[in-house]
């Protein structure tokens, strides 16, 4: 397969993934196919975001690492010493992707390390390994292009997380601001009583203890439920089961109480 065709294969993966959640496993598989090597996509903290094996390495420690999807902390930190692509590192390199305890089996093993950079910061590392065949210029072009694509996807995922956080917070703030003073007071007492994300509430008991009507509690819960912040379910004489759906709610409530 020519370089242009291989590049187009990476592009096709990008186009097919448009708008869908990031799938680093598929990315690793595509890079494995076009570069013909083992591929490991490693986050800043050593989490294995995706990997694909072209040539099996029989080693218990490696198997455990892949199962746990976590690279050793020391190795991950050392990768940050590589600011640009470092190719064809042998088994004696501290950056080798081969198990050094089986050095004799992997004498010809070669590793290439490509930093994943996006938005001016180091987001992770793309690691490629082969049992013997040297990584040529075309392989390195594809690896660096692949690392750029992975970096773009990591940034997109981060942006989506930030957006989701902001949306959750805004929904909670709107829901809380829709409550009257007495409803807000009722909600504060309810969640003091629950002491967590979910639990059983007997509205009449809280109403009697705090000195508010039961209807205030019911209205307050309805407002939060219609905003999608909580869900509630009547269990008859036992009371009402309440569960927090928006993880920003209790934090915002705590902030209000501390002011």
Curated annotation (Swiss-Prot):
Keyword Membrane: no
Highest rank taxon of the organism: Bacteria
Positions of region (GAF domain): 1-155
Phosphoserine modifications at: 215
Chief place of localization: cytoplasm
Protein's GO biological process: negative regulation of DNA-templated transcription
GO molecular function: DNA binding; DNA-binding transcription factor activity; GTP binding
UniProt-annotated location(s): Cytoplasm
Similarity-based family: Belongs to the CodY family.
HAMAP family named among the record's database cross-references: HTH_type_CodY
Protein's recorded name: Global transcriptional regulator CodY
Protein source organism: Bacillus licheniformis (strain ATCC 14580 / DSM 13 / JCM 2505 / CCUG 7422 / NBRC 12200 / NCIMB 9375 / NCTC 10341 / NRRL NRS-1264 / Gibson 46)
Species classification: Bacteria, Bacillati, Bacillota, Bacilli, Bacillales
Gene: codY
